[in-house]
Structure formats: structure tokens, C-alpha cells
């Protein structure tokens, strides 16, 4: 074959491989018919941003259908996705892509991909070497990526739950950072997360991918230039005390981020959808407890252990384990409230979703309430899907979930009508985990309203302090996503309790060691596990 013929053949193959789409103002009839009305403009926004920057952040609220809209964008762009997501979400991605008729190159979880592996077939059990990525020895050169990508030209890479990749020092963070080489090759990268950022420093990797900074190490220097760029957000009030000034500075920083990244983001807010989305009432609710004094004492002990950790005292090597045991004890002492409130809502014809942190709490509640549907870290995918199916079909009226196992990527909304959902939740350490858990019941397509309650114990000041701390982080998320400091705040209400029933005393059960807690998945590089318990 001569040079001219070879050149022409390359042109033909490249034309087939890379879709030539320069703008998009309407969706195809096939795609449009499968989207809710409020999703259509968002899909067009995703496509427009990808065509301009080859990078987009979808920060839409949990439950509006980010998976479906990402798949729709792939279809409209004519690209075959490589999906990187938590393992529990793999079957959902496969079914959604099939729904849109989108063929994919790969669907793989973070841990498998970081080890240069993927799955052999659609059963997602047996692994093989991944042809699209390999680890790179950068010889101590921090400017070199930790992974090298080699993907087809018509691919699109989607990082689902991308808030798991916000720390540049973790393997997850390095994996996401390495995707910049794809963006530079005009291969689109999509990040999906309703909680991409809880604090200013969480934006290091997004800023790097957006080419604002040459490396995440340049983040602080870039931040100083933003203060000059946005003088309207300088904190000038000299009468603020130290705590007030800290809050004001953080608020200003998050609003600056909102301004800086808005060209790269698209977002659907539930509160803008009106009656297109199920009514969702939520608050943190206080309940009286006979064990409030013991719970307060446990928090005092946690606060003291935290202070000793901050002071780096030599004898505190077991403090983190002690803190976990105390947190579990506090959750166990809330069991009577969970039982009473669950029975109350069942009598009202509601279906109840319970979120807790520890497997021991889950086991006791399951026995007391005869719960058959469970979502936890030590079950198979088939067991997990069976529990979801029984609850979604309204065969079972209660489902109980560990927050880290059941707070992401599952839908528990009322599909058929007449079975309104109630969520009862013990708050987790992370504001992101809280938002994710509270997004399981209010989903697009739900047929009934949702009531959600974060369980607090009255007369325990530490619980209210924790809620204030969580609200601050939620305000950061809201400000970065929407430029609104009030978007995700939970009101603290007083709750009423019935006459106490005679229940087995939960705190006599053995305390779990934190190393056996399946809520924690060390391979997924989850962050923000140890907040300051006394922060206000």
C-alpha cells in the first residue's frame, strides 16, 4: 500500500473512531423519550461542556438520575464509556447503559482498576488484566502521573462518586489526576458527585484537571491569586472573633470556588423542580432517652481522647479504637428510639428505611423488628439485590442499611404508589455520607412523598454540636455547587416519644472492634473518618 492510500485509510478509520460533533442543541427522539422533562436540558449542558472543555462535573442533587443522564450523554455523543465506580454500582450501570442501548468498553470498580485489572465478562466476578491502564514508576518525579491511560479514541471516561478521589495523596486521587492526559488528548472525562467538595482544599484535583494549576502542590499559591481576583469576597469585618472569622473566611472561599468552576459544572437542584420531584421533608429531630446521661458521658470521653490525639501524647496509640467503641456504644443506646419510631410509622402505613453505622446495631434492630431486608458490607451482590427488590416491590416494609454500604448508588423510592417512605438515620462522621444516605428515598420517578429524620438525643449538647459541624460542611457543599450558603442545612426539631416498651438492653452486647466493621472499606480510600467531635 502506498503512502497516499495509507493516509486515506487512516482518515477513514479516524472518522469512524472519533465522533465529529461540534455542538448540540437538541436530543434525538430516542434519547429524549427516555428522559424526564427536567433532565433534557441538563444532558444538553453536559454535552456542551464536554465539547468545549472535554471535562465536566455533574454536581446534581442525589436522586435526580445522574447515571441515566450520563448514559444519555454518551449515546448522543456516540461514545463508548469506561465507567469507574464503587463495586456495588456496577450492575446498575450495566442496566442503565443497556436501557439506552449504549455499548461500553468497561465497567470497573476503583480498587480493581488501581491494580491494573478489570472483569472478564458481564458477571463481574473473574478478573483479568485491564488493557486501558497501567501503573507508572515516576522515579520520585511528582509531575509524572501515577497511571498511564491507553483508550480508544471514541471512548469517554466516567468517574462515578468522584468525591472518593479528592485526596491527591491516595491511590484514588492519583487515578483521577492521571485522567488529565485523557483530557489533553480530547477524550472526554465526566465526574459525577453531589458532594464533590466539603472544604476548600477538596478542589485540588478538580483545579488541576481544569488546568488552573500545573499540579496540586500549586493549589495554595493559586488560592492567593483568587483572593485578588474576587475582592468582593474579602473578609473585612475586624470585629469578628476568631471562630466567627474562620467561618466567614470559609464561606468566602466556597463562594469563590463556585464562581471559578461554574463553566465546568452542570447541576440539577431538587428544590428547583417543584412538583416534578417527590416532596421530601427532612430535619434532625431530638428524642428523649433514658440513657442521655450515659451518652453525654461517652461524648465527654471522646472529646478528651480527641484532645489527647491533637496534643500527640505518647500513650494514645489506641485512642482511635477507643473512640470507635464509644461511638458504637452511643449508637446502641439509640436503639429504643429507632424501634419505637419504626413501629409508629409502620402503623401509619409507611415503609421504613433505617440507616446505622455499625453491624452490631443492625443485628439487634433486625432481631427486634424482624427485618429481612439488609444492606451491609459482608453480603454478596445477589443478597443485596434481593433485599432491594423485596423492599421495592413492597413485599417487605422495612429495610436496614449500613451507611457506608447502603448510602451510595441504590434506589429505595416508592415505585408503585401508596407506600410512602420514611428514613430514620443515625448521623455518620461524614457530611458527604449523610447527603448520600438521605438521597436513597427521594428519587426521580417516586410516587409518594418522603419523610426523613436524623435521630438526635435531647439534652446532649455534643449531638447538637455535631449537627452544627455537619451543617457547616453541608453549607460548603451547597456554596460550591450553587453559590448558596443555606442550601443544605438541617433544622433541629423536638421529637416526642411514646411510653417506653420493655426491650432487651442493647448495650450489654459485645462492642465490635473497628477493624471488623464492614462499613469501612480500606481499599476505597474513603476520607473524613475522624471529624473534630467538639467543633461548632
UniProtKB/Swiss-Prot annotation:
Residues 288-334 form a coiled coil. It is an enzyme of class 3 (hydrolase). The keyword Nucleotide-binding applies. GO terms for molecular function: ATP binding; ATP hydrolysis activity; DNA binding; RNA helicase activity. The keyword ATP-binding applies. Residues 502-536 are annotated as: Disordered. This is Putative ATP-dependent RNA helicase L364. It catalyses: ATP + H2O = ADP + phosphate + H(+). ATP binds at residues 60-67. It comes from Acanthamoeba polyphaga mimivirus. It comes from the Viruses.
Amino acid at each position: 500500500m502506498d503512502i497516499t492510500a495509507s493516509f486515506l485509510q487512516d482518515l477513514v478509520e479516524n472518522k469512524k473512531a472519533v465522533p465529529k460533533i461540534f455542538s448540540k442543541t437538541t436530543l434525538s427522539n430516542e434519547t429524549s423519550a427516555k428522559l424526564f422533562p427536567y433532565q433534557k436540558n441538563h444532558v444538553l449542558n453536559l454535552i456542551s461542556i464536554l465539547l468545549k472543555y472535554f471535562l465536566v462535573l455533574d454536581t446534581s442533587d442525589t436522586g435526580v438520575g445522574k447515571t441515566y443522564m450520563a448514559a444519555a450523554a454518551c449515546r448522543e455523543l456516540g461514545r463508548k464509556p469506561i465507567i469507574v465506580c464503587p463495586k456495588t454500582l456496577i450492575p446498575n450501570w450495566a442496566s442503565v447503559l443497556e436501557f439506552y442501548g449504549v455499548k461500553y468498553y468497561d465497567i470497573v470498580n476503583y480498587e480493581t482498576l488501581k491494580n491494573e485489572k478489570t472483569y472478564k465478562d458481564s458477571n463481574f466476578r473473574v478478573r483479568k488484566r485491564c488493557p486501558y491502564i497501567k501503573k507508572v514508576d515516576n522515579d520520585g518525579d511528582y509531575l509524572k502521573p501515577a497511571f498511564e491511560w491507553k483508550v480508544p479514541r471514541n471512548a469517554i471516561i466516567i468517574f462515578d462518586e468522584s468525591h472518593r478521589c479528592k485526596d491527591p495523596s491516595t491511590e484514588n486521587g492519583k487515578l483521577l489526576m492521571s485522567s488529565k492526559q485523557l483530557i489533553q488528548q480530547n477524550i472526554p472525562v465526566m465526574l459525577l458527585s453531589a458532594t464533590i467538595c466539603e472544604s476548600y482544599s477538596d478542589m485540588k484535583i478538580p483545579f488541576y484537571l481544569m488546568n488552573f494549576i500545573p499540579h496540586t502542590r500549586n493549589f495554595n499559591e493559586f488560592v492567593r491569586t483568587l483572593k485578588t481576583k474576587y475582592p468582593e469576597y474579602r473578609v473585612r469585618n475586624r470585629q469578628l472573633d476568631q471562630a466567627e472569622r474562620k467561618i466567614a473566611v470559609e464561606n468566602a472561599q466556597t463562594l469563590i470556588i463556585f464562581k471559578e468552576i461554574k463553566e465546568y459544572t452542570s447541576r440539577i437542584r431538587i428544590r428547583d423542580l417543584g412538583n416534578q420531584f417527590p416532596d421530601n421533608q427532612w430535619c434532625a429531630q431530638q428524642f428523649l432517652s433514658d440513657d442521655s446521661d450515659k451518652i453525654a458521658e461517652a461524648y465527654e470521653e471522646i472529646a478528651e481522647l480527641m484532645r489527647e490525639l491533637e496534643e500527640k501524647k505518647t500513650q494514645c496509640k489506641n485512642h482511635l479504637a477507643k473512640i470507635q467503641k464509644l461511638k458504637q456504644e452511643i449508637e446502641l443506646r439509640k436503639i429504643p428510639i429507632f424501634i419505637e419510631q419504626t413501629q409508629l410509622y409502620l402503623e401509619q402505613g409507611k415503609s421504613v428505611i433505617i440507616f446505622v453505622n455499625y453491624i452490631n446495631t443492625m443485628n439487634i434492630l433486625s432481631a427486634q423488628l424482624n427485618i429481612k431486608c439488609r444492606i451491609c458490607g459482608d453480603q454478596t451482590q445477589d443478597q443485596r439485590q434481593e433485599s432491594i427488590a423485596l423492599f421495592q416491590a413492597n413485599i417487605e416494609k422495612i429495610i436496614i442499611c449500613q451507611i457506608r454500604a447502603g448510602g451510595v448508588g441504590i434506589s429505595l423510592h416508592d415505585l408503585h404508589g401508596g407506600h410512602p417512605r420514611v428514613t430514620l438515620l443515625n448521623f455518620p462522621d461524614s457530611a458527604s455520607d449523610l447527603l448520600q444516605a438521605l438521597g436513597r428515598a427521594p428519587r426521580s420517578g417516586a410516587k409518594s412523598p418522603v419523610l426523613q429524620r436524623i435521630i438526635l438525643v435531647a439534652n446532649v449538647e455534643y449531638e447538637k454540636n455535631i449537627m452544627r459541624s455537619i451543617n457547616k460542611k453541608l453549607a460548603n457543599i451547597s456554596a460550591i455547587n450553587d453559590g448558596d450558603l443555606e442550601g443544605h442545612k438541617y433544622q433541629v426539631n423536638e421529637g416526642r416519644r411514646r411510653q417506653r416498651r420493655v426491650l432487651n438492653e442493647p448495650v450489654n452486647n459485645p462492642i465490635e472492634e473497628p477493624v471488623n466493621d464492614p462499613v469501612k472499606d480500606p481499599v476505597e480510600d474513603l476520607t473524613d473518618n475522624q471529624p473534630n467531635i467538639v467543633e461548632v
